[in-house]
Each structure stands twice: as structure tokens, then as C-alpha cells.
Amino acid sequence: MLVLTLSSEVNGFTYDKNSHNFMLTHPNLEIESDCSEYAINSSNYRFWEPPIQKYIKECNEGLQGSREKNFNMRWCGSMVADIHRILMRGGIFIYPKDNKLPQRAGRLRLMYEANPMALIIENAGGRASTGREPILEIN
């Protein structure tokens, strides 16, 4: 699927092998507001800041926890694939700052990873932030 955003509209196109064209198959994509999926590399839990640890702990507690809802973790190690799933089904993608390599805090590259995905997510009705500021407002 090819995803294109212009202005505030996000559209998905699928390649048609017969016509050799990309056909509009998912017009006006909007992120589902009520979803119980999150994407995070939980193997780095011990390196995260306490607020992220708390949020993931609460998600993992499910119905018995303070969020009173069962959540599913999805992580495939590809931001593009995770963002595609979020566009199709809703959810949250989390790539938190950690203290594993303090000199490299935040490993998503702003110009060709974070900004393009943030623009798509924001235009589809979602939010994209560092946890402290909107990604699209970073200079």
C-alpha cells in the first residue's frame, strides 16, 4: 500500500498488477480512537523513563489494572509496518527515549523517519509527540 497525505487528508492506494496503476482503495483514512493495541519494543523496559514504564505496566495489567481494559502488544521491529497497522486498526506506536545508550537518546531520525510518519498520523486524526512536544514542531 502507498499512503499519501495532502493537506489534512490521508489516502491509501494499492497497486493493481493488471492496470499497472495505484488505485485508491482506502480513502480518507482516520485512526480509530478506541483501540487496545500498542506497539513498543518491550525488551528495553528496564531502560525506559518511569512514566513509560508505568504506562506499559498499566496496559499489561489488563482488566484488573487501573485502566480496566485488556491491551495487546504488537511489535514487528519496523516503524512503517507498525504505523500501517495503526492506520488500519488504530493503536499507539511508542519508541521511547531510554538510558541504554544515553549519548543516542531517541534513535528515530527526525527528517526521514519521525517527521513523515508524524505528518501522516496527525493528518489521519492521531497525535505524534516526543512525549514532551509535538514532533512536527521540532526545529
Label every model-predicted segment.
Residues 1-139:
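IMPase-like, lithium-sensitive Mg2+-dependent phosphomonoesterase catalytic core
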